[in-house]
Amino acid sequence: YSISGGKRFYVGKDKNPFSFFLTAGHTTDYQYTDEIIRNTTTSGTVYKDMNGKKYAENISQLALANVDFDMQNRHHISYNLMMIHANTQSVGDYNGKNSIFSDDYENLGFTRRQQTNDNMLIVNQLMTNWGLTKSLSLDAGASYNMVKGYEPDRRINNLTKAEDGYTLLRGNSQQRYFSTLDEDDLNVKAGLVYRLKDNIEEISNVRFGYTGRFVDDNFKATEYNLTVGHVSAIPSLDDFSLDDYYNQENFASDWFKIQKNLDEYIVKKNIHSAYAEATYQFTPRWIVNLGLKYDKVDIEVDYNVNRGGSKGNNTIQKDYFLPSLNLKYNLNDKNSFRLGASKTYTLPQAKEISPYRYVGVNFNSQGNPNLKPSDNYNLDLKWDFNPTPTELISLTAFYKLIKNRISRIEVASAGGYLSYENIADKATVAGVEIEIRKNLFVRPVSNAAHGMNKLSLGLNGSYIYTNAKMPLATVTTGSQLEGAAPWIVNFDLSHNFTKGERSFVNTLVLNYVSDKIYTIGTQGYQDIMEQGVLTLDFVSQAKLNKHLSLNLKARNLLNPSYKLSRKANENGEKVILNDYKKGINISLGVSCTF
């Protein structure tokens, strides 16, 4: 459910407009998933093969607020607040083979994972624009954003097959885990805009100013390993409670012991930027934009993780000069061409540069403190054709050269894990994208002053070619880049019928993403591939009158399988590592407007 409202006032003798808007919503949904989890050695030998049933409850809340105030048509102040809260609670039971289980019974066993993820995002934005003179204005603003991520009391329990049923696995196989991630993100900006006279559309201007971003990430985790001293048989998995084994009485009698491990990392990122930019319309057809930006980047990471096995610090200090050029040529009222060239960079994320090892359901993952930022050189050419004001045909060709590309890789260590590496000195990306918005028909409705019967379609598709020579990869001669799907297609068909206060909108949305590399294989591992998926959604809204509306949403109607796979080195056979379906989600809603 959701609620929203707003109001506009006029303040003072100058009738300065003041407005506010508020909205808030709450959703809850439940999921049940059957999934397959496997893993192999580099040769293709399966050492983990488990079937799982996962039950999850997802709760989310959203709140938005906006306040705007205009003064004398010269000054503007606005404040935006956004709060997003998401809570997911899940329990997964997995049966099957795992090399951690006793080999006396073919490494068979049972794993239960209970997990809660509680995340909160709070965004505060204050934006101002001050008209200093008729030609000069000041843009200034600040935002303070907070991310709170909690994983309270995650529990992982492993039971190995035994003669009399099952027994609790010894070692570090019974865990309770608590973690917190706090991110504070402060952004500030101040810039002057001087409008130039071009005697055409009066869009020419010169801009220069400063922006700053200051981010602190603080992560803390506490892990408790419950080491079993005396093993008792559990006859059946159908009716057992771990509280019967892990309780105060058994702890006092040394039935089990508790080992506590603390992990912590801190990542500080400071970016100071100065920029200058000029836009000028030389003729009714030609518009040129030229810019130069200087960024001073300072990143520091301190860590003491993995039970003290990884302890240290590292810094990234970079100075970037980032030029950009954009040209627009208006051939006529319906056709235009754009050319853009720029240099940008990509910084590693906090989780990518901390060597903390996170234990996941499918894979463990660990950051790399020695990562370097990537440099990106971008070029794109775009043609836009507008047959009518509501229709569009657009074609874009693009090229990107990436130096020190950051990619996710698989490391063939004991147990194996996913990490991050500057996988190639340079990588290339090239492709084309097409976008079409077309009205199949637009007809007036008889006996209605305000009526319309409209059928329209939208199509967005792209082909992306990527290649890089990767010395660290198992296949060094050249490979696609991780995460880049060669083919992406989005299609929608929408029917809109309006008659007076009533309206009916029905939309069918089809999305396709082709196979892509999920993780690049190294040290003998082949690449992990993510299978392409085709999804279909249907959304319908019926506005019965100015106060009442009905909404129907049917998501994931095709319910495709999401699969990860990897080929074995010895025979090239494809092994499915993960296989699950998200399920079909159907919801019906009622909206009331006052």
PLM region descriptions:
Residues 169, 181-185, 189-191, 237, ...:
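Outer membrane beta-barrel strand-and-loop segments of large Gram-negative receptors
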Residues 512-519, 541-594:
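C-terminal beta-signal and adjacent terminal beta-strands/loops
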Residues 24-30, 83-87, 144-150, 180, ...:
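Transmembrane beta-strands of outer-membrane beta-barrel pores
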Residues 397-401, 418-516:
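Gram-negative outer-membrane beta-barrel transporters
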Residues 1-93, 122-123, 325:
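Transmembrane beta-barrel wall of Gram-negative outer-membrane proteins
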Residues 148, 243-254, 298, 333-378, ...:
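Surface-exposed extracellular loop regions of Gram-negative outer-membrane beta-barrel proteins
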Residues 86, 175, 179, 195, ...:
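Signature of Gram-negative outer-membrane beta-barrel scaffolds
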Residues 10-19, 73-74, 133-137, 197-206, ...:
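Short loop/turn motifs that connect adjacent beta-strands in outer-membrane beta-barrel proteins
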